[in-house]
From Swiss-Prot:
GO terms for molecular function: structural constituent of ribosome. GO terms for biological process: translation. It comes from Euglena longa. The keyword Ribonucleoprotein applies. Its main location: plastid. PROSITE patterns: RIBOSOMAL_S14. Belongs to the universal ribosomal protein uS14 family. Binds 16S rRNA, required for the assembly of 30S particles. This is Small ribosomal subunit protein uS14c. PANTHER family: 30S RIBOSOMAL PROTEIN S14, SMALL RIBOSOMAL SUBUNIT PROTEIN US14M. Keywords: Plastid, Ribonucleoprotein, Ribosomal protein. Part of the 30S ribosomal subunit. The gene is rps14. Pfam families: Ribosomal_S14.
């Protein structure tokens, strides 16, 4: 299981991304639409003034139960280990072990 501090840091990043999402998208649209080079530089400078963790590319998918960052199944929100255990015990409806 991941450290609680790392999981909390990821939660904080998610909230910052959510908070600044509309502003970031608005400024990015303005940068694409602007014809003046200096205005583009100014808008880019404004974009850089946002908190570093408000950028969505700094988010990392983590398992809902354990916080494990690798082997993550997006559809279920679980890591491969937890997914396997839950599927084995029948806790994921519709998931069956394949056999052919």
């Amino acid at each position: 299981m991941s450290k609680k501090s790392i999981i909390e840091r990821e939660k904080k990043r998610k909230s910052l991304v959510k908070k600044y999402k509309n502003l970031r998208n608005f400024i990015k649209k303005e940068i694409k639409n602007e014809l003046n080079f200096f205005e583009k530089i100014f808008l880019n400078f404004k974009l850089q003034k946002f908190p570093r963790d408000s950028s969505p590319c700094r988010l990392h998918n983590r398992c809902y139960l354990t916080g494990r960052p690798r082997g993550y199944y997006r559809f279920f929100g679980l890591s491969r280990h937890i997914f396997r255990d839950m599927a084995h015990y029948g806790l994921l409806p519709g998931v069956t072990k394949s056999s052919w």
